[in-house]
C-alpha cells in the first residue's frame, strides 16, 4: 500500500512538473502570438491568394523542425510533428483568408490593403478573425515542438485557404484540401478547430455537441421579363417587380412553412442586379443569396419550395424565372463522444465557469468537410474585451477582437491535442453526420 502511495506521489510530481513547463512555454509565446496576429491583420490576403501568409507560416514551421508541405489546395500549408512515441494522429486547423472589406478601425496595425475582387478594386480586411486563428495555431506548433517528449502520436497542423469561399470559377477551401488528401498520410483520427468570437468575452469558450453551425447553400435566381419604356410599363413585363415579389415570397417559406421550433432556417438575398437607366424597364434581373439550415429534411423541403415559388410567381406576372441552388458547406457537426472526451480538458484550461454550452448558430463553416471524414470538435473562443457592452460584428468594417484572448486558444488546442493523443479513447465516425 505504501509503495502505491509513493508511486502516486511520483506520478503527481511528474504531472505538476510537466504542467509547469507548459505554463512557462505559454508565457514565452504570448507576445509572439500577438505580434503574428497583428502582422497578418495588417497584411491580409483574399481567398486562394494567401501567398505571403502561407510563406510566413511555412517559414515558421520549418524553423521549429516540423515537416512542411505547401501548395495544398492552392496556398494551403501542412505541418507534421511526430512525437516521441507512435500513436494516433490529431489534426488542428486554422483558416488563413481575409474578406473584401475596407477597415474602419483606427488601429496601429490597421489594414490598408487593397486587391481586385470580381473585377473591382476593394479593400481587404481580416473581418472574421482568421488572422487570430493563424497566429494561435503557429503558437500551438511552437509549444508542442518544444514538448515532443509529451506527444504520443502525431500532430498535423492544417493552415487552410479560402474558408470564405473560392473566387468564382475556382475550387478551394476545406473541400479541396480533403480532395487532395490532407487527412491522409498519415491518416487523421480526429480534428480540432476554433473560431474567435467578438460577442463572447475574453477567457470564455463556447461549444455545442452535435449540429453546431448551419449548412450553407448559394442560390441564383434569373428573372426574364420584357423590356419597355419606363413610362409605358403596360407594354412590357417588369423583372424588377417580379424580383420584389419573389423576395417577399421567399420569406414566407421560412415564416409559414418551416417548423422553426425544431431548427432555424434562413433565406437571404444578398445581391440584386437589373437595369441600366432610370427610364428603361429592363429585360432581365438576377439575384444571388444564401440559405442556412440545420436539419436535412428541412433543407430538402425548403429547396423544393424555393424552386417552385420562384417559377410560379414569375409566371403569375407574365415572366419567367429559374432558381439554381448549389452547395457551399455542410452542417458543422461536433462528434458527441469526442466532445464528451475533451470537455474536461477545456474546463481545466478555461475554468468550468468559463466553459459554456450554447445553441446552434446559422453561421456556416467549411470545417464541416473535415468532419464528414473524421470525428471533429469545433468551438468558439472569446474575443470581446472584458467589461465591454458593445461588440463588433464579424464581416463588418468595424470588426475587432481583443488580443488578450488569444493565449487561451493556444492553451486549449495544445492541451486538447496532448490529452487526446495520450488517451485510449478513439471515437469513430461509423455513420456520417445527419444533422
Model-predicted regions and their roles:
Residues 1-21, 435:
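Bacterial Sec-dependent N-terminal signal peptides
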Residues 19-125, 135-152:
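Acidic/His- and Gly-rich active-site-bordering loop/insert found
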Residues 21, 28, 32-35, 39, ...:
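Extracytoplasmic/secreted proteins, especially bacterial periplasmic and envelope-associated proteins
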Residues 27-31, 44-55, 127, 131, ...:
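Soluble non-cytosolic domains of exported or imported proteins
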Residues 40, 79, 92, 130, ...:
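Divalent metal-coordination and catalytic microenvironments
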Residues 63, 244-435:
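Metal-dependent amide/peptide-bond hydrolase catalytic core
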Residues 81, 223-225, 291:
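Hydrophobic beta-strand positions in extracellular immunoglobulin-like domains
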Residues 113-125, 131-132, 143-144, 149-271, ...:
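Histidine/acidic-residue-rich, glycine-tolerant segments that coordinate divalent metal ions
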Amino acid at each position: 500500500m505504501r509503495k502505491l502511495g509513493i508511486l502516486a506521489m511520483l506520478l503527481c510530481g511528474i504531472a505538476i512538473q510537466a504542467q509547469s513547463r507548459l505554463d512557462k512555454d505559454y508565457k514565452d509565446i504570448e507576445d509572439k502570438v500577438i505580434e503574428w496576429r497583428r502582422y497578418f491583420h495588417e497584411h491580409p490576403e483574399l481567398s486562394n491568394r494567401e501567398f505571403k501568409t502561407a510563406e510566413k507560416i511555412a517559414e515558421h514551421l520549418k524553423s521549429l523542425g516540423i515537416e512542411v508541405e505547401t501548395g495544398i489546395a492552392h496556398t494551403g500549408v501542412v505541418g507534421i510533428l511526430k512525437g516521441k512515441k507512435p500513436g494516433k494522429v490529431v489534426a488542428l486547423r486554422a483558416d488563413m483568408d481575409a474578406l473584401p472589406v475596407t477597415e474602419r478601425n483606427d488601429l496601429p496595425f490597421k489594414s490598408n490593403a487593397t486587391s481586385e475582387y470580381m473585377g473591382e478594386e476593394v479593400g481587404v480586411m481580416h473581418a472574421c478573425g482568421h488572422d487570430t486563428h493563424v497566429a494561435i495555431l503557429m503558437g500551438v506548433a511552437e509549444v508542442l515542438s518544444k514538448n515532443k517528449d509529451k506527444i504520443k502520436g502525431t500532430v498535423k497542423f492544417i493552415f487552410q485557404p479560402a474558408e470564405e469561399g473560392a473566387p468564382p470559377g475556382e475550387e478551394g477551401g476545406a473541400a479541396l484540401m480533403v480532395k487532395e488528401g490532407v487527412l491522409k498520410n498519415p491518416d487523421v483520427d480526429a480534428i480540432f478547430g476554433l473560431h474567435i468570437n467578438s460577442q463572447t468575452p475574453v477567457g470564455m469558450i463556447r461549444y455545442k455537441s452535435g449540429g453546431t453551425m448551419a449548412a450553407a447553400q448559394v442560390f441564383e435566381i434569373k428573372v426574364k421579363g420584357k423590356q419597355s419604356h419606363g413610362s409605358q410599363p403596360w407594354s412590357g413585363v417588369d423583372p424588377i417587380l417580379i424580383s420584389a415579389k419573389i423576395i417577399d415570397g421567399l420569406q414566407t417559406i421560412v415564416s409559414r412553412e418551416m417548423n422553426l421550433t425544431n431548427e432555424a432556417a434562413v433565406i437571404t438575398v444578398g445581391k440584386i442586379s437589373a437595369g441600366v437607366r432610370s427610364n428603361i424597364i429592363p429585360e432581365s434581373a438576377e439575384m444571388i443569396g444564401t440559405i442556412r439550415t440545420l436539419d436535412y429534411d428541412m433543407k430538402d423541403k425548403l429547396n423544393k419550395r424555393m424552386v417552385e415559388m420562384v417559377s410560379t410567381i414569375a409566371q403569375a406576372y407574365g415572366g419567367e424565372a429559374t432558381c439554381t441552388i448549389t452547395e457551399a458547406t455542410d452542417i458543422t457537426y461536433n462528434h458527441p463522444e469526442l466532445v464528451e472526451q475533451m470537455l474536461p480538458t477545456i474546463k481545466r484550461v478555461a475554468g468550468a465557469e468559463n466553459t459554456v454550452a450554447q445553441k446552434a448558430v446559422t453561421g456556416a463553416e467549411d470545417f464541416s468537410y473535415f468532419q464528414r471524414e473524421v470525428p471533429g470538435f469545433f468551438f468558439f473562443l472569446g474575443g470581446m474585451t472584458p467589461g465591454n457592452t458593445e461588440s463588433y460584428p464579424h464581416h463588418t468594417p468595424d470588426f475587432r477582437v481583443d488580443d488578450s484572448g488569444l493565449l487561451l486558444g493556444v492553451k486549449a488546442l495544445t492541451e486538447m491535442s496532448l490529452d487526446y493523443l495520450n488517451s485510449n479513447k478513439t471515437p469513430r465516425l461509423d455513420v456520417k453526420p445527419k444533422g
